[in-house]
């Protein structure tokens, strides 16, 4: 449907950002299962995205592929690293198509844009075309990472966020921010309100890999780490009421 434009409101005073990148892991789509996709979970996340889209915010999305195949894990088990990474990229395309179906069932038009050419299921990545989709209020789901092995989907999300002129990256996780120690193991763990890129790197806080953090720092892209399991968590940050950690310069 080349002329489809999702009706919506212009991003106004109720949204802190007009264009954002949402990065979620592939594992977030598998619910309580140990592998693959859990359709009710995919639908729940799609509704979270729809809620933000209804605010008039332009949304870019990158989903990992770890619920299906993880390149590093395959490499550790003896596979050739480049081949394993390409297999991981294909897994992200599968997740992107699943999310596209869930979003469009809710009336949110999307485009899956792949860094690896596969014309039958996704558009090739062309920056100006992708920006035009965003301006038409279509959610752009960027798949297949950067199209190159040895780069994570965190790095791909930061790269696309920079290219798309996003104002912030939202990293959806299982916890509501960055902690000084694992909150699942330590009851006295303290959540940071803000943390710098350099502190993330020096303290190995695990927000994103070093390449992604360095690229975000270079382009002055704030990273919001929040809980994807918290209902309304994504939208609450945009309306100024959410709980999260902000990674800044």
Curated annotation (Swiss-Prot):
SUPFAM superfamilies: Carbamate kinase-like
Molecular-function GO term, any one: ATP binding
Pathway note: Pyrimidine metabolism; CTP biosynthesis via de novo pathway; UDP from UMP (UMPK route): step 1/1
Keywords associated with the record: Allosteric enzyme, ATP-binding, Cytoplasm, Kinase, Nucleotide-binding, Pyrimidine biosynthesis, Transferase
Binding site for ATP: 23-26, 66, 70, 173, 179, 182
GO biological process, one term: UDP biosynthetic process
Coiled coil: none
Annotated GO CC locations: cytoplasm
Regulation of catalytic or functional activity: Allosterically activated by GTP. Inhibited by UTP.
Gene3D superfamilies the record matches: Acetylglutamate kinase-like (3.40.1160.10)
Entry-linked CDD domains: AAK_UMPK-PyrH-Ec
Top-level taxon of origin: Bacteria
Reactions it catalyzes: UMP + ATP = UDP + ADP
Enzyme Commission number(s) of this protein: 2.7.4.22
Keyword Protein biosynthesis: no
Region listing for Involved in allosteric activation by GTP, in residue ranges: 31-36
EC class name: transferase
Binding site for UMP: 65, 85, 146-153
Quaternary structure and interacting proteins, as annotated: Homohexamer.
Protein family: Belongs to the UMP kinase family.
Entry function: Catalyzes the reversible phosphorylation of UMP to UDP.
HAMAP family from the UniProt entry: PyrH_B
NCBIfam families on file: pyrH_bact
Listed name of the protein: Uridylate kinase
């Amino acid at each position: 449907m080349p002329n489809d434009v999702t009706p919506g409101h212009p991003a106004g005073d109720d949204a802190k950002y007009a264009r954002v990148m949402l990065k979620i892991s592939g594992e977030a789509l598998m619910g309580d299962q140990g592998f693959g996709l859990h359709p009710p979970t995919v639908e729940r996340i799609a509704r979270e995205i729809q809620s933000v889209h209804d605010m008039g915010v332009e949304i870019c999305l990158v989903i990992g592929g770890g619920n299906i195949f993880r390149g590093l894990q395959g490499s550790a088990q003896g596979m050739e690293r480049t081949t394993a990474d390409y297999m991981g990229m294909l897994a992200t395309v599968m997740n992107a198509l699943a999310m596209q179906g869930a979003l469009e069932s809710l009336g949110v038009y999307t485009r899956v844009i792949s860094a690896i050419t596969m014309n039958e299921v996704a558009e090739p990545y062309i920056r100006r075309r992708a920006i035009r989709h965003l301006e038409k209020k279509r959610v752009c789901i960027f798949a297949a990472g950067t199209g190159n092995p040895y780069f994570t989907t965190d790095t791909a999300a930061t790269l696309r966020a920079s290219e798309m002129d996003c104002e912030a990256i939202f990293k959806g996780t299982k916890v509501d921010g960055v902690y000084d120690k694992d909150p699942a193991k330590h009851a006295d763990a303290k959540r940071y309100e803000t943390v710098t890129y350099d502190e993330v790197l020096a303290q190995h806080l695990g927000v994103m890999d070093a390449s992604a953090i360095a690229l975000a720092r270079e382009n002055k892209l704030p990273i919001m780490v929040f809980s994807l399991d918290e209902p309304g968590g994504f939208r609450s940050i945009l309306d100024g009421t959410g709980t999260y950690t902000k990674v800044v310069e």
